Amino acid sequence: MAMKRKKISVIGAGFTGATTAFLLAQKELGDVVLVDIPQLENPTKGKALDMLEASPVLGFDANIIGTSDYADTADSDIVVITAGIARKPGMSRDDLVTTNQKIMKQVTKEVVKYSPNCYIIVLTNPVDAMTYTVFQESGFPKNRVIGQSGVLDTARFRTFVAEELNISVKDVTGFVLGGHGDDMVPLVRYSYAGGIPLEKLIPKDRLDAIVERTRKGGGEIVNLLGNGSAYYAPAASLVEMVEAILKDQRRILPAIAYLEGEYGYEGIYLGVPTILGGNGIEKVIELELTEEEKAALAKSVESVKNVMRMLE
């Protein structure tokens, strides 16, 4: 029997979706299908063709197509959802919830119809609530519907720590718990540089400032760009998760997982440390938390629940 390449579909061909597609192809993780709405079919095809034409120069073998027809996504191994509207001036987060929830429902129906055995990774904001929507709509088991926020939040944290210490980002590990918002909980106690606890290397006031900057990391970029939000680091974070699943790496990565009692929470999607491998979320790792960390997590959960109350 011929070996088949893996197939990854990316829903939403905006900056994040297109960047994700390009990185996936470059890493030769599989053939890539980039999907957007019919009104944007030509630009989507154009982006895909442009990427494909980079393949001889960069030396990667992956087919990339752009489409608005979900039939082209049939039998995907992984589907990444980046579709949705971004917040515009004058819009409340509530507006975002209602519109993006509708989009998630439509997208999920199509995804499930053509790829009933796929794994789904959701990036669309507010991501905790949108991942929950996709989970409900898909009827998939919890290990196959995953949200991305922690890899990105942790990457930001690691970047700021490496800058502070003037060292390689490769030597910094960190963990961010909770919702993807201003109440996220970077766990400094479980963060290291070259195996040395950060608390031994960075004074408390500087660490606190790094934590605060991490929480506001997305907003910092939104303000600098003036139009739109981050896409390079979010795309890179998605690719790391896709790779962990497709290669069954069993990586310990923060991901938005469905909790059934872990950390004392039930029936909610939340950012937690997980083992990510060939079966998607294979395990939620429960860390011992201090009272202060538990309180911070509870506040983060409350923020997520407030958004979830807006779901139809």
UniProtKB/Swiss-Prot annotation:
**Keywords, comma-separated and alphabetical:** NAD, Oxidoreductase, Phosphoprotein, Tricarboxylic acid cycle
Query: What is the uppermost EC class here?
Result: oxidoreductase
Question: How is this protein named in the record?
Answer: Malate dehydrogenase
Family matches, as Pfam families: Ldh_1_C (PF02866), Ldh_1_N (PF00056)
Q: Which GO terms describe its biological process?
A: lactate metabolic process; tricarboxylic acid cycle
Which residues, renumbered to this chain, carry the PTM Phosphoserine?
S149
Q: Which residues of this protein are catalytic?
A: H180
- Per UniProt, where does NAD(+) bind? G12, A13, G14, F15, T16, G17, D36, N100, L123, T124, N125
Gene name as annotated? mdh
Instruction: State the family it belongs to.
Output: Belongs to the LDH/MDH superfamily. MDH type 3 family.
The organism encoding this protein is Geobacillus kaustophilus (strain HTA426)
Query: Which parts of the sequence bind substrate?
Result: R87, R93, N125, R156
| Annotated S-S bridges | none
**Gene3D superfamilies per the UniProt record, alphabetical:** Lactate dehydrogenase/glycoside hydrolase, family 4, C-terminal, NAD(P)-binding Rossmann-like Domain
Q: What is the role of the protein in this entry? A: Catalyzes the reversible oxidation of malate to oxaloacetate.
MF term (GO), any: L-lactate dehydrogenase activity
InterPro entries in UniProt:
L-lactate/malate_DH (IPR001557), Lactate/malate_DH_C (IPR022383), Lactate/malate_DH_N (IPR001236), Lactate_DH/Glyco_Ohase_4_C (IPR015955), Malate_DH_type3 (IPR011275), NAD(P)-bd_dom_sf (IPR036291)
